[in-house]
Amino acid sequence: MDTKQAYLSKPWLKHYPEGVPEAPSIPDLSVPELIDQLADKYTNNTAVIFYGKKITYGRLKELIHRFATGLAAQGVKKGDTVALYLLNCPQYVIAYFAALKLGAKVTPISPVYTSKEVKHQLEDSEAETVICQDILYDNVKKTGVSLERVVLTSISEYLPALKKWFGKSALAKAYGGMHVPTPEQIKEAGLLSFQDLIHKYPPKPPQVTIDPIKDIAVLPYTGGTTGLPKAAILTHRNMIALQAQVLSFWPLFEEGKEVSMAFLPFFHIYGQVVVMLSGLALGSALVLFTTPDIDEILSAIERYRASAFYGVPTLFEYLKEYEKTDRVNWKRLKLIVCGADTLHESTIEAWERRTGSIILEGYGMTETTAVSHASPVHRPKKGSFGIPIPGMRAAIMDHAGKDLMPVGEVGELILNGPNIMQGYWKRPEGTDEAFVELEGEKWLCTGDLVSMDEEGYFHFFDRKRDLIKHKGYSVFARHVEEVLYQHPQIKAAGVVGVPDAKVGSVIKAYVVLESEARGKISEEEIVEFCRKHLAHYKVPQIVEFRGELPKTDVGKVSRRELREESEGR
């Protein structure tokens, strides 16, 4: 078999669970049409649970339609961009689907963004409307961006009566320094009320024709790992396809009978599509958390008999040692998934020893509408992030972007499927650079260095931009970090290459020690530890201790920030 056929023959298909299709049936629907169908099908089922407050699918549809009618009355129309600057709460779900109901584009903004970052996204996305948490309004005001309308909402609006004060105080603690605008300020600025739009308008939004294939649904912004964040263009078809792909790959659930923990932030594509949209598509109840309080999440898993739990590496690394983790019967859950970054093998092993349950890893990015690969439930492989989900094609290309790599060799992962973005918003050059042609079709270049083994499982090595060239050798930053994490006194680590005229790049390790080890372990001891476990050319030449490391929105160590800092930028 030639190299090209080794990938195009899809060797991973033999590992699909029985009954899983090579490609799923994708409904010819827009996202709001899907939500309306689900609401009619599961009318009396619980859709959202918010700190004890329950909202049925029927009631959720009514709220979505009322809010859509209210937005339309304020001038929001098809083609507009509506920004959501919200924490996880029922208002997020309502506003998200209401904007889509009108044919508008949604651009979710991270609640932890500074006013400068908010300004960039508002201007770049051409948003005219912002749905905003009241405690975040100051950041919108500071941007100075001219907006047609700002709708304010409070986290307490959908809290049970006994939780209202607690909710406000918890948020004040989490978002210290932020304050709610006074009634006078609201009136002076002409701000709209979320609840007023709900109560004043009937559930009769205007009829809008949406082309699922052509019309944009969401403009999610990438993390800005190279320059300013940019938006991936995701159509209604992309969104509908992804939920169909994911649900067909994990045929574990009973429609209308599942409960999913929804603490991953909805502004991020992982929480937005895998948790929120796919959860609702299954008729599940979503248990929402505004802030990721571990004790509350663990209690809710048992209280509501949760069946699905989606997390990120930092969460599992914390839970594997947390004293209250054993309060949950993890073996009862049907699905435990880790995404957004690779999980250290030591964490996987410690988790399995402690809980008796298995974490399934997956892979994806904003540009793939969250997911392209996942681990089959019956046959996960350690060290692998899984196999392509139904409808996906994957291959490994050489560094020059011309030829496919032989099976087992490392190169750049390229992808093709119905969930792949249409391109980057207002960046035609970036779009052209993001795709390569294979077999007469466009394939997405992920920028990730990956290999595929003989069985069709894929293995992650590093981001292409994080590959360090030292004395002519290629060094994967992640490989060095994996060794550092094996040290019992290292809590966190980030490795980058620092440009050097003589050797290409010097390898630098930023290290956070466990509190009891600080001041007792030297930089040279860390270097010596690495010498015992790494080839000579992979050993860091510089070690710098830190109290903490910069993180991305999903808790990854931000190598970009470390790299910029080390280069004096």
Language-model features: where?
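AMP-binding/adenylate-forming catalytic core of the ANL superfamily
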Residues: Y113, V130-D134, F309, G417, ...
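Conserved AMP-binding/adenylation subdomain of ANL enzymes
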Residues: I240-V259, F267-A308, E321-Y322
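Conserved AMP-binding/adenylate-forming core of the ANL superfamily
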Residues: S25-P27, D36, N44-C89, V93-F97, ...
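Flexible, low-complexity linker/hinge segments
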Residues: V20-L29, S169-I216
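Conserved adenylate-forming
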Residues: Q74-V76, K200-K214, L219-A262, S284
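Conserved ATP/PPi-binding loop(s) of AMP-dependent carboxylate-activating enzymes
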Residues: I387-G391, K402-F435, Y473-V475
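Structural core segment of the AMP-binding/adenylate-forming
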Residues: A73-Q74, K101-D196
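Gly/Ser/Thr-rich phosphate-binding loop
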Residues: A306-G311, K320-K381, R393, K402
